[in-house]
Amino acid sequence: MSITKEFDTIAAISTPLGEGAIGIVRISGTDALKIASKIYRGKDLSAIQSHTLNYGHIVDPDKNEILDEVMLGVMLAPKTFTREDVIEINTHGGIAVTNEILQLILRHGARMAEPGEFTKRAFLNGRVDLTQAEAVMDLIRAKTDKAMDIAVKQLDGSLKTLINNTRQEILNTLAQVEVNIDYPEYDDVEEMTTTLMREKTQEFQALMENLLRTARRGKILREGLSTAIIGRPNVGKSSLLNNLLREEKAIVTDIEGTTRDVIEEYVNIKGVPLKLVDTAGIRDTDDIVEKIGVERSKKALEEADLVLLVLNSSEPLTLQDRSLLELSKESNRIVLLNKTDLPQKIEVNELPKNVIPISVLENENIDKIEERINDIFFDNAGMVEHDATYLSNARHISLIEKAVDSLKAVNEGLELGMPVDLLQVDMTRTWEILGEITGDAAPDELITQLFSQFCLGK
């Protein structure tokens, strides 16, 4: 997808394909109204007020055949998402009707939109910056209300405003330094310039580092925690998974080795999306299929952000239990003593501190797991502060880290007594890096790659 401005008219189905109450076919571009007028039977579209919904029919003019009864939305530039004329045809949901209407639109002069092209046009026409464009996709993919809150704030421009204000402050600083260097009016101009550069650099660095402190929380809320449920066979792992999901997803039996693969499901734990991985019981086995499951379990353990180790409190610790305790000791781990509804036989004094006794069968202490997750990953400080700006995107985090490195280079140069005019290079580099976040200084290849990840019709 080229990032150069194109002014042809594009169209796509904007709702998920499949059966549903409503389907939406979107048209955007200079000929949107003209194309819609050819296939719409109802009020004269050229006389219709912008931002209104209008009842009518979509008709194939070549056959004089009605395709569907619709509500047609007219939105005229520049007050639209793309800042172009936009038509949205609200049809009855279904693959056949929406596709038939789309093909009719394409035959009358529109081009099939590429993935993310509507949002790309919003970016190219100055309606949104890159952070806001990425927030659109984050909002679509949000799995919890907390992730949605972060995406909405970013879409509203919170990160854009912070970055743009910082870039402007950097420009102001560079301009002042340049004036001091080119037009020295005081004997101590060099000292004044060095002091200004040091103060501003430290200010910018502190701002960027504060932003980075939100990254861990923001990334978790955006992408979720990969959570491995581990334990020897038949200790209640699958029952725990089903309990957390509030539905039967894993087979639960008394037969060892029932879970032969890795089962993955998302669950919302107090606003945090957990990707729960129910692993096959880790044990020595000659069963080839089960052995593959065990190897996948070990891999899931290595890659997990959080480990839930399930032990059977009604039995003494086994060699397998001890092996799993050792294997997971460096992980963010919560040890769960299941089957507390039975007489306890496990050696509690040999276990790590802060284990949680639970009974999956009787749904006892499951809420304690949620509280412990909050303690481990959020320092019990709550999930999202209402007015805070969060970093949650890996691209943004990487660029902010690079900006901090550039600012550190300026500070180190000042400590070594390097001339301020040489240090302007690193300060300018910081300004450029921050511009990559908003798209003001992003390479064409990056922009093309970002929008290609969007769904068709968005």
UniProtKB/Swiss-Prot annotation:
SUPFAM superfamilies: P-loop containing nucleoside triphosphate hydrolases. Residues 224-378 form the TrmE-type G domain. The keyword DNA damage does not apply. Keywords: Cytoplasm, GTP-binding, Hydrolase, Magnesium, Metal-binding, Nucleotide-binding, Potassium, tRNA processing. K(+) binds at N234, T253, I255, T258. GTP binds at residues 234-239, 253-259, 278-281. InterPro entries: G_TrmE, GTP-bd, GTP-bd_TrmE_N, GTPase_MnmE, MnmE_dom2, MnmE_helical, P-loop_NTPase, Small_GTP-bd. Belongs to the TRAFAC class TrmE-Era-EngA-EngB-Septin-like GTPase superfamily. TrmE GTPase family. HAMAP family: GTPase_MnmE (MF_00379). This is tRNA modification GTPase MnmE. The gene is mnmE.
